């Protein structure tokens, strides 16, 4: 599987359950979300805007734009978690399995976040991003086409660290 196949398989509606561990305090949180993954056209204004902010030509053939939206709760339903982010995947010219990652939250006017991706020979996607003192490493993989797993580790200055595990089940329409 290459990066294009991975994101095409990701398109659709998902139910996500997650557990988040604060590695410093030991606090544990659980949450659930409805997640929608949409592949963007290269003519999408938000995609073009993020590309322009990063001096990237949005007409690059292999470029992939993805919008991820979620609506859920954390901590036994006490904290609402609603948002979206856009990812732009820019494969290396000579290797679709590695490349640059651009992302933002929401409407395209938020601070840009950049990083790298590697699509492993084991079909595990690893995203690494850094911005404003934040370092995030995420891993995604499919057990079957309708069941995706995700882990992440978030590190901030002053020793703040989180680790999470998510299982995501595709909503299949009858």
Curated annotation (Swiss-Prot):
| CDD domains registered for this protein in UniProt | lipocalin_CpcS-CpeS (cd19433)
Q: Could you tell me the keywords of this UniProt record?
A: Lyase
From the record, give the transmembrane residue ranges: none
The EC number of this protein is: 4.-.-.-
Note one Pfam family from the annotation.
CpeS
Matching entries from Gene3D superfamilies are given as: 2.40.128.20
Signal peptide annotation: none
* GO MF, one annotated term: lyase activity
Q: Which InterPro entries match?
A: Calycin, CpcS/CpeS
Membership in a protein family: Belongs to the CpcS/CpeS biliprotein lyase family.
- Tell me, in a sentence or two, what this protein's role is: Covalently attaches a chromophore to Cys residue(s) of phycobiliproteins.
UniProt name for this protein: Chromophore lyase CpcS/CpeS 1
């Amino acid at each position: 599987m290459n990066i294009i196949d991975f994101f095409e398989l990701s398109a659709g509606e998902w139910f996500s359950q997650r557990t988040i561990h604060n590695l410093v305090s030991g606090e544990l949180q659980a949450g659930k979300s409805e997640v929608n993954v949409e592949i963007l056209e290269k003519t999408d204004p938000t995609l073009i805007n993020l590309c322009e902010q990063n001096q990237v030509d949005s007409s690059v053939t292999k470029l992939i734009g993805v919008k991820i939206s979620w609506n859920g709760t954390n901590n036994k339903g006490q904290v609402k978690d609603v948002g979206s982010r856009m990812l732009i995947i820019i494969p290396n010219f000579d290797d679709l399995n590695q490349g640059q990652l651009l992302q933002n939250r929401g409407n395209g006017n938020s601070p840009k976040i950049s990083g790298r991706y590697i699509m492993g020979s084991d079909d595990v996607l690893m995203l690494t991003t850094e911005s404003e003192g934040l370092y995030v490493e995420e891993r995604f993989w499919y057990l079957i086409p309708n069941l995706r797993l995700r882990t992440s580790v978030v590190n901030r200055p002053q020793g703040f660290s989180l680790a999470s595990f998510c299982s995501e089940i595709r909503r299949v329409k009858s």
